[in-house]
């Protein structure tokens, strides 16, 4: 059975590679087809950029596998194939809803290891849960832990989805963040495949409206000049108003102070750009040059299943002298 699954994955991966051997165009979107919830990684091992995402275009957010694309210049993207399939024996605890992944590259001894976190639908039923798979390569193959690492909400409501991983350059400690309807964070153990349960902290930004910063989902954390930046998405992923807001903290587990001007990225109807959110952030290594990677609704599906027809985009993100984030102008 294992051989059959591997053959299936290899065949499917080859099909993707043949269909999208390389994708390049001026402007956005940067990937072919429908993808959402993008996570970007720069690999110190390969000196390439990688994007991981929810495979979109399926009714009811029913995608069941993850693919990965690589690039050396953020413009030309190569399909590396399927790296995790939730409907195969590769992931014994889940059977679908492969959503919103994140990944961390860690130097373990003298070898780079890759820890891939994601949410899936458990075979036992109930709400979504979060799992982890590992690899020696950013493109895989990945081996799942065999069971979820986050199964329940610390608030008693919401979903265990939209996981983010962050390693604090100040301390070397790594953290997970997750939650729809709430934001939770916890320190990871050194093994990167389990959390320190005693550190679980509910840190949902309070207040706001759907027009500014009312928290919905998709936490993302990064560090710059002594501050921890927390980003999140507002409203529903199928809404043109879906957008990104942020706050800051002096600690990786909060509390979070909402920014005076919290909206980072929002729709631009004049350019037919709708629902730009659920982002990750890239700092170009060795520079203070930053990019925001996000999805938006494909304009042709604005009135027909917009929440499952999304496309991945990249734009520059800049800071004011006081460290606040300038509002990003989304581009086509």
Question: Which role does the model predict for each range below?
Answer:
Residues 23-332:
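Carbohydrate-active catalytic/glycan-binding domains of CAZyme proteins
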């Amino acid at each position: 059975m294992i051989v059959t699954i591997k053959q299936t994955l290899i065949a499917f991966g080859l099909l993707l590679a043949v269909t999208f051997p390389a994708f390049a165009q001026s402007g956005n979107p940067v990937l072919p087809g429908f993808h959402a919830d993008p996570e970007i990684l720069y690999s110190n091992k390969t000196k390439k950029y990688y994007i991981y995402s929810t495979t979109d275009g399926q009714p009811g957010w029913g995608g069941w596998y993850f693919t990965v694309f690589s690039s050396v210049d953020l413009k030309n993207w190569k399909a590396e194939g399927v790296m995790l399939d939730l409907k195969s024996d590769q992931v014994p605890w889940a059977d679908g809803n492969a959503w919103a992944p994140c990944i961390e590259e860690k130097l373990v001894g003298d070898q780079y290891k890759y820890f891939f976190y994601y949410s899936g639908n458990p075979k036992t039923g109930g709400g979504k849960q979060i799992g982890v798979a590992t690899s020696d390569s950013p493109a895989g193959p990945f081996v799942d832990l065999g069971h979820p690492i986050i199964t329940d909400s610390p608030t008693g409501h919401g979903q265990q989805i939209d996981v983010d991983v962050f390693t604090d350059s100040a301390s070397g400690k790594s953290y997970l963040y997750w939650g729809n309807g709430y934001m939770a964070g916890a320190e990871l153990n050194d093994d990167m495949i389990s959390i320190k349960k005693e550190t679980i902290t509910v840190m949902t930004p309070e207040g706001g409206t759907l027009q500014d910063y009312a928290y919905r989902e998709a936490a993302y954390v990064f560090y710059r000049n002594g501050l921890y930046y927390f980003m999140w998405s507002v409203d529903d992923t199928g809404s043109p108003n879906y957008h990104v807001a942020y706050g800051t903290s002096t600690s990786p587990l909060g509390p979070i102070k909402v920014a005076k001007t919290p909206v980072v990225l929002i729709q631009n109807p004049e350019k037919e750009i709708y629902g730009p959110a659920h982002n990750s952030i890239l700092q170009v290594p060795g520079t203070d040059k930053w990019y925001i990677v996000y999805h938006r609704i494909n304009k042709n599906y604005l009135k027909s299943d917009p929440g499952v027809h999304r496309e991945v985009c990249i734009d520059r993100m800049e800071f004011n002298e006081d460290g606040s984030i300038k509002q990003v102008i989304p581009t086509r």
